[in-house]
Amino acid sequence: MKRLVIMAAGTGGHIFPGLAIAETMKARGWQVSWLGTSHGMERELVPKAGVEMDIIEFSGLRGKGLQHTITGAFKLVASFATCFSILKRRNPGIVLGMGGYVTVPGGWMAKLRGVPVVLVNADAALLLSNKTLMPVAERVLFGFPADFGPAASKALVTGNPVRQEIISLPAPAERYAQHSGPLKVLVVGGSLGAKALNDAMPLALAMLPPEQRPVVTHQSGKKNIDALRANYAQAGVDAEVLDFINDMPRRYAEADLVICRAGAITVSELTAAGVASVLVPLLVSTTTHQRDNALWMEKQNAAIHLPQSELSAQGLAELLQGMTREKCKQMAEAAYANGRRDANAAIADVLEKLVKIT
């Protein structure tokens, strides 16, 4: 029996690609389990997908003050012992790190047990957790071509894993031909929401005459749903507001335009499905990954790059007013032309080559 432990924790950007690989490997007859935490999105999403999960109590060491750092250090030490015990019990032939701090103790303990370690790196630049695991990794699978630096000898560009339901959507020309009526806009701030989009979108729609307003579905993030609903009510605008979208493939299929962040997994999904987008990169002082992703998409005529520093209700209203379904379709087709729909199989093939039969 071929056994895989997937290590991933935190946000949807780590969890959904891992679930895509879990589905692929189970279809190939593998036994798959998950190593995660009790406080990340994996706690809810992984069991729903029918994947067994083991939990460690660790959430990283950076930020949040001295007490958090000290407590985190003790939890890190304990997590190594817990991971060793879990891996002994699960007896995997290979482990796959998708990102998040959970991969660090899991990866090192896998190496100690002689289990091959493969890492997925969604962005062109190395994740901090993957840098930490570089000495023990057999392969590092990148979502995008880049200067791989210290990972060069182990690097392989496979593209990012995307859920099969997204890959299997009809091509943009077929989908957009079936759309009619007002534009349908999907606003997604990532699995945790995005306050900048939550603030600007209701005001932007209020500036448009009712007959020119698109039909909007807006994912708020669980912590922001009440505030966002209040924003729409105060603006006098109707919108479908959801804390989390469980049926994203269907939402992509129905949308003419997606307004969202520019994370690597989001971009991979938009290009795999072929959906037009307005990309508002997350402002992070230490990286430019999302900005680079948005600029690349804009260069392919697949998206509009809207820096958060330039995001305003007035500007967003003008952008929406000038948007047509034909323009959206053209961007969607450009996105589709740049999509990789073979990443799941490419990653699965790497795992097949490196696995130890247990």
Curated annotation (Swiss-Prot):
Family membership noted in the UniProt record: Belongs to the glycosyltransferase 28 family. MurG subfamily.
Reactions catalysed, as given in the entry: di-trans,octa-cis-undecaprenyl diphospho-N-acetyl-alpha-D-muramoyl-L-alanyl-D-glutamyl-meso-2,6-diaminopimeloyl-D-alanyl-D-alanine + UDP-N-acetyl-alpha-D-glucosamine = di-trans,octa-cis-undecaprenyl diphospho-[N-acetyl-alpha-D-glucosaminyl-(1->4)]-N-acetyl-alpha-D-muramoyl-L-alanyl-D-glutamyl-meso-2,6-diaminopimeloyl-D-alanyl-D-alanine + UDP + H(+)
NCBIfam families: murG (TIGR01133)
Chain's role: Cell wall formation. Catalyzes the transfer of a GlcNAc subunit on undecaprenyl-pyrophosphoryl-MurNAc-pentapeptide (lipid intermediate I) to form undecaprenyl-pyrophosphoryl-MurNAc-(pentapeptide)GlcNAc (lipid intermediate II).
Enzyme class: transferase
Subcellular localization: Cell inner membrane
EC number, as in UniProt: 2.4.1.227
PANTHER family noted in UniProt: GLYCOSYLTRANSFERASE, UDP-N-ACETYLGLUCOSAMINE--N-ACETYLMURAMYL-(PENTAPEPTIDE) PYROPHOSPHORYL-UNDECAPRENOL N-ACETYLGLUCOSAMINE TRANSFERASE 1
Swiss-Prot/TrEMBL keywords: Cell cycle, Cell division, Cell inner membrane, Cell membrane, Cell shape, Cell wall biogenesis/degradation, Glycosyltransferase, Membrane, Peptidoglycan synthesis, Transferase
GO MF annotation terms: UDP-N-acetyl-D-glucosamine:N-acetylmuramoyl-L-alanyl-D-glutamyl-meso-2,6-diaminopimelyl-D-alanyl-D-alanine-diphosphoundecaprenol 4-beta-N-acetylglucosaminlytransferase activity; undecaprenyldiphospho-muramoylpentapeptide beta-N-acetylglucosaminyltransferase activity
Gene designation per UniProt: murG
Pfam assignment, any one: Glyco_transf_28
Subcellular location, principal: membrane
Pathway: Cell wall biogenesis; peptidoglycan biosynthesis
UniProt name for this protein: UDP-N-acetylglucosamine--N-acetylmuramyl-(pentapeptide) pyrophosphoryl-undecaprenol N-acetylglucosamine transferase
Binding site for UDP-N-acetyl-alpha-D-glucosamine: T11, G12, G13, R163, S191, I245, Q290
Any one GO biological process: peptidoglycan biosynthetic process
Signal sequence range: none
Keyword Transferase: yes
CC per GO annotation: plasma membrane
Membrane topology: Peripheral membrane protein
